[in-house]
Amino acid sequence: MVPKVGINGFGRIGRVVLRNALETGAVEVVALNDPFIEPHYAEYMFKYDSTHGRFKGDIKVDGKDLVIDGKRIKFYQERDPANIPWKDSGAEYIVESTGVFTTTEKASAHFKGGAKKVIISAPSADAPMYVMGVNEDTYAGANVISNASCTTNCLAPLAKTLNDKFTIVEGLMTAIHAYTASQKTVDGPSSKDWRGGRAAAQNLIPSSTGAAKAVGKVIPELAGKVTGMSVRVPTVNVSLVDFTVRFAKDVTYDEVKAAIKEASEGPLKGILAYTEDDIVSTDILTDPHSSTFDAKAGIALNKNFVKVMSWYDNEYGYSRRVVDLIVYVSKKDAGQ
């Protein structure tokens, strides 16, 4: 049975999760909630997308609900997650994509309205984090879980592959990251992050990220061995992980490429991709993989010290994994 899904927060990730749900048919979205968007505006925002293009299906408003390709999706406008009547629509698996309710306690408010499980589409301070292809098999039935971050979803499959094969001693990551909705179009106030308040489309902006350290949470043997930072760049979508790593074993760059290619065609197929083409960022737009290893972009200094680079659509690939995680946990919950 296809899991019935509700989405709280109809922003970039909320809308792209819905696109992925419709594209795959793997889950059925039956309800949406966003207190800041009324149904006609939600229709417009979903239909027209500057990054991923116009929605090719049929969408209209009927009363207070959306009807997409003939299927009704309940639309709520509650500010408090505890007041969202998920049970009325049959939504059991809730995608928490507001970026606000990212702790177990805050996300648990959804249960008051009839939710069965909450999947936070962001890193969480205390909810178990899962990265598909890396540690989903450790899922133990927690009712609030996290899909980690888009950058962790790019780095972790790569790090797992390299660590399993060659043993990582230590690694540093730089995420060359497209700007996001949290940034400013022109210089503006940002008291906690002064650089982050500068104009997104005009600047390269060094920033912090917990994505690399989070790899240690999903791959415990790498805890304390990997860290990183990010640079926000003036592009609207698609990012690039630059991972410099020291191995315990002697290895050539060709062996690194071969290991990643093997993983991309085997256990990580559909999650980790491999390319030897001379691609640039727009070539990854709307790509559903978590991570696309760029074989030509990496380099080795010696037999232990290597730089690898991997692309990711930080919206689309990440949102596809949200859908995949829901499918996975729903099967586990059903005892399959």
Curated annotation (Swiss-Prot):
PANTHER family: GLYCERALDEHYDE 3-PHOSPHATE DEHYDROGENASE, GLYCERALDEHYDE-3-PHOSPHATE DEHYDROGENASE-RELATED. D-glyceraldehyde 3-phosphate binds at residues 149-151, 180, 209-210, 232. Homotetramer. The lineage of its organism: Eukaryota, Fungi, Dikarya, Ascomycota, Pezizomycotina. Belongs to the glyceraldehyde-3-phosphate dehydrogenase family. It is an enzyme of class 1 (oxidoreductase). GO terms for biological process: glucose metabolic process; glycolytic process. The keyword Ligase does not apply. This protein is a koningic acid (antibiotic)-resistant GAPDH isozyme. It is present under antibiotic production. The gene is gpd1. Pathway: Carbohydrate degradation; glycolysis; pyruvate from D-glyceraldehyde 3-phosphate: step 1/5. It catalyses: D-glyceraldehyde 3-phosphate + phosphate + NAD(+) = (2R)-3-phospho-glyceroyl phosphate + NADH + H(+). Its EC number is 1.2.1.12. It is found in: Cytoplasm. Its main location: cytoplasm. The record marks 177 as: Activates thiol group during catalysis. NAD(+) binds at residues 12-13, 34, 79, 314. One of its GO terms (cellular component) is cytosol. GO terms for molecular function: glyceraldehyde-3-phosphate dehydrogenase (NAD+) (phosphorylating) activity; NAD binding; NADP binding. Inhibited by koningic acid through the interaction of cysteine residues with koningic acid even at very low concentrations. The active site is at residue 150. This is Glyceraldehyde-3-phosphate dehydrogenase 1.
